[in-house]
């Protein structure tokens, strides 16, 4: 189960009873949403740039966060990143690793952005990319018969 910086399950701040193992399995989306890592990192970088432009964070903090996010992207791309199912999704895995790399400044990633904002942004970016890929594949299939005829 995903935990906050105080090592509590995210939902556990109000609910004191442990969830069933079935609930934990159903709530764990990591195996599905690993594919969103590029979008999650891209969305976080853009968000941090906005925080800097709005003078919410300093140039130094912005660069530190972006450095950490880029390092995580390289780790995932090179298959050196260790996903942990106890953090239940890609967002929490990346967040936990960012805290390990840069420390408390990682907490700024959620300034003025909810988890729902993060999830929907990731999904929209992924959908945009997947749509382009489908379009490109369909163009290849459409042009293939033409090449054979001429």
Model-based region annotation:
Residues 2-143, 147:
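A helix-coil-helix interface module used to build multimeric assemblies
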């Amino acid at each position: 189960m995903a935990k906050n910086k105080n090592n509590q399950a995210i939902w556990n701040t109000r609910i004191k009873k442990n969830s069933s193992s079935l609930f934990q399995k159903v709530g764990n989306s990591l195996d599905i949403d690993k594919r969103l890592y590029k979008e999650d990192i891209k969305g976080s970088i853009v968000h941090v740039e906005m925080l800097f432009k709005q003078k919410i964070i300093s140039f130094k903090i912005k660069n530190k966060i972006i450095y950490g996010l880029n390092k995580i992207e390289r780790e995932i791309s090179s298959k050196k990143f260790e996903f942990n199912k106890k953090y239940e999704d890609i967002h929490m895995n990346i967040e936990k690793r960012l805290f390990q790399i840069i420390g408390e400044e990682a907490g700024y990633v959620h300034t003025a952005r909810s988890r729902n904002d993060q999830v929907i942004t990731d999904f929209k970016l992924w959908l945009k990319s997947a749509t382009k890929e489908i379009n490109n594949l369909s163009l290849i299939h459409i042009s293939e018969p033409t090449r054979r005829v001429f």
